[in-house]
UniProtKB/Swiss-Prot annotation:
UniProt record similarity statement: Belongs to the QueA family.
HAMAP family per UniProt: QueA
Catalytic activity: 7-aminomethyl-7-carbaguanosine(34) in tRNA + S-adenosyl-L-methionine = epoxyqueuosine(34) in tRNA + adenine + L-methionine + 2 H(+)
Compartments reported by the entry: Cytoplasm
Subunit and interaction comment: Monomer.
Organism for this UniProt entry: Borreliella burgdorferi (strain ATCC 35210 / DSM 4680 / CIP 102532 / B31) (Borrelia burgdorferi)
MF GO annotations: S-adenosylmethionine:tRNA ribosyltransferase-isomerase activity
InterPro entries: QueA (IPR003699), QueA_dom1 (IPR042118), QueA_dom2 (IPR042119), QueA_sf (IPR036100)
GO biological process, one term: queuosine biosynthetic process
Organism superkingdom: Bacteria
Name the UniProt record assigns to this protein: S-adenosylmethionine:tRNA ribosyltransferase-isomerase
Keywords on record: Cytoplasm, Queuosine biosynthesis, S-adenosyl-L-methionine, Transferase
Amino acid sequence: MKTKEFHFNLSHSLIEQYPSEKRGSSRLIVLDPQLQKIYHKNSVNNILKYINSNIFNNSKARKSRIYAESEMSSNVEFLILDRIDTNLFTALVSKSKKQIIGNFYKFPEGLMDEILSKNSSEVVLKFNNNVGEDYFEKHCFVPLPSYIKRDYDKIDEDRYQTIYSKYVGSTASATAGLHFSRDLFSAFENNNIEYDFITLHVGAGTFLPVRSKKVEEHNMHFETFLIKDFVAVRLQNAKLLGKRILSIVTTTLRALESSYDNNLKKFKTGQQSTNLFIYPGKNYCFKFVDMLFTNFHTPQSTLLMLVSSFAGKDFVFSFYEEAINKGYKFFSYGDAMLILNNI
C-alpha cells in the first residue's frame, strides 16, 4: 500500500491554534463504520450516551522544549526525548546540519552539554551534571507541535496536559484526552460509567509522518507502557460481562492490543514495550478494544493509518472530507471523534 494514499489537503485555517474556551466544549463527530453513518454533536459531553467502560492513558508530557547557546553564540532549540542515564538524553535539535558531534552548548543555570552521537536530527546529549525532572519543569516549555504557528502561551502549561496526567515521560501529549473535564469525570461516576488508566509514554515517532513510499516498509518506533494488575482484572471482567471497551486515544489502544492475549482472555501486566503498527491491508483483527475516541490526525501519520484500519480507510476519508466541509478543527487542540465500532 502506498503511503501517499493517506495524504489529504487541509487549509491552515482549520488547524486549531488554541485550546477551546472550556474542556469538553469542542465539537464531536460520532461515527458508525458498520452502518456507514455519521452524526454531528455540538460538544464532547454528548459522549455519555454511548459508553460504559473507558480506559485512559495517564502519562504526562515532559516540558521538554529548551533553548541553549552554541559555541558560536547562536540560539539552538532542543526537544528532549528520552532519558538514557542521569546525565544522558536523546533529543531532536534545530538547525541540525550545523550541530555536529563534539559541539558544546550552554543551557540555563550554566549547565553544559556535548553532542556524543548523531543520527539525522536526533542526537545524544551528555550534560556535565545529573539532570532531574525539576530542571526540565523549571526551564523547559511544553512541546507544542510545529503546526501550532504562534508564540508559546502560559495557558499551554495547563491545557496541553490532560487533567488526569500523572507520570512524566511522554514527548507529546495524548491530545484526545485534553477534552475530558472534571465535570465529565463526575458524570461518569454519577452514571456508573467505569474508567481506568494505563500508562504509555508517547514517543516522538507517534506523530511523525511515514517517510517510506510503501506503508509496509515503515520502521515503527517502540513505546513503553505499564498495565497494573488490578486494572487488567477490571478490564477483563468488564469484557466478560459484555461491556464495550472504549479506548481514549490511539496510544491507549496500542497498549491494550499489544498486551492482550486473545486465547487466554488476559492481559500481560507490568512494564512492557510495543512497536505494534496497525494499518489497512495488514488484516489486523482487534482483540480487545470495541470503540475509539480520538482527534483528527495529520496526513500520512501512523495514527491516521491506525484509525483507517479500525473504521475502514474509505469511510475515514469520507468523514474527514465531510468534517473539512463543515469546518471542524483539526489536530492537537481541535475537535474530536468517537468511533462506535470497528469493521
